[in-house]
């Protein structure tokens, strides 16, 4: 998740250098952003594969057949998508950042991914008094 975001673009570039297809969950409204990223990185639809879905839905809104099709094809799930806008409502932040992360973990389990990588901001730690080490 988050392939078209600031960090995601750099991660996708590095993953593509490994020579294996990269699957990117992308909102239907962001498919053009993924096309632009393909152009920038010299990727094709076969090397940078769009998985249109919704972070807020179970299995990202994919059908059981679509989930089954992805089993065994994805070893690592990288979850970068989040709402960082502090002006966003608490409900919107919860749906994206809490429920979305839960959905990403469950999706990784559903497709049999062996590794789940979550990238977030320091805000994910909540209120903390002290020094992060």
Please give the residue ranges for each predicted region:
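Residues at the starts of beta-strands that form the adenosine-phosphate
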Residues: 20-21, 47, 114-115
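Glycine-rich, N-terminal phosphate-binding loop of Rossmann-like dinucleotide-binding domains
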Residues: 26, 80-81
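Conserved glycine-rich Rossmann-like NAD(P)H-binding loop of the short-chain dehydrogenase/reductase
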Residues: 18-32, 120
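Conserved Rossmann-fold cofactor-binding substructure of NAD(P)-dependent oxidoreductases
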Residues: 42-76
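Short, conserved SAM-binding/catalytic segment
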Residues: 32-45
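N-terminal Rossmann NAD(P)H-binding glycine-rich loop of SDR-like oxidoreductase domains
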Residues: 1-20, 24
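Conserved Rossmann-fold NAD(P)-dependent oxidoreductase catalytic core, especially the SDR/UDP-sugar
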Residues: 76-80, 87-95, 99-133
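Flexible cofactor-recognition loop at the NAD(P)H-binding site
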Residues: 5, 82-83
